[in-house]
């Protein structure tokens, strides 16, 4: 299939003559400068898309809960939180008691927006009182990375 596409005359002309690709564009800048936005833009929650409540699992054994939290910390769908939470869990979750494990479960599953967790952990936004627990304080300390540990990938399982 690729050979057929490459052998077509129109594709060959584009490959041989790259100026044809740019023929429609005038005043193309040599250098593009990017700037960071001055503030975080948060939109109000849409009333049309209700987020279901996370089911509370009171009878879940502690080891099963820790295994579930390990998985959920690694699979957030957001690379920043994947790295922060997976390294946090690898370091601290094994030593958590039932109360601390419940606090961590509430933190990562009670919030409907993962960006909130990220902003709270990095002290970009103030943490609401219901999530300002000992586990959150420990997470904030972990995010500061005072030991200068390299966190470019998730820890091995």
Swiss-Prot record:
Transmembrane segments: none annotated. The keyword Cell division does not apply. Gene3D superfamilies: Flavinator of succinate dehydrogenase (1.10.150.250). The keyword Chaperone applies. One of its GO terms (biological process) is tricarboxylic acid cycle. InterPro entries: SDH, SDH_sf, SDHAF2. Interacts with the flavoprotein subunit within the SDH catalytic dimer. PANTHER family: PROTEIN EMI5 HOMOLOG, MITOCHONDRIAL, SUCCINATE DEHYDROGENASE ASSEMBLY FACTOR 2, MITOCHONDRIAL. Belongs to the SDHAF2 family. This is Succinate dehydrogenase assembly factor 2-A, mitochondrial. It comes from Drosophila mojavensis (Fruit fly).
């Amino acid at each position: 299939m690729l050979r057929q596409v490459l052998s077509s005359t129109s594709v060959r002309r584009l490959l041989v003559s790259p100026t044809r690709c740019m023929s429609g564009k005038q005043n193309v800048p040599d250098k593009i400068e990017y700037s960071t936005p001055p503030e975080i833009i948060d939109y109000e929650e849409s009333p049309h898309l209700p987020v279901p409540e996370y089911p509370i699992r009171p009878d879940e054994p502690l080891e099963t809960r820790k295994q579930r939290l390990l998985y959920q910390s690694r699979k957030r769908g957001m690379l920043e939180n994947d790295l922060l939470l997976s390294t946090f869990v690898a370091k601290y979750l094994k030593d958590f008691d039932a109360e601390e494990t419940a606090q961590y479960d509430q933190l990562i599953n009670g919030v409907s927006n993962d960006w909130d967790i990220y902003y709270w952990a990095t002290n970009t936004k103030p943490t609401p009182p219901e999530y300002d627990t000992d586990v959150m304080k420990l997470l904030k300390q972990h995010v500061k990375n005072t030991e200068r540990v390299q966190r470019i990938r998730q820890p091995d399982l």
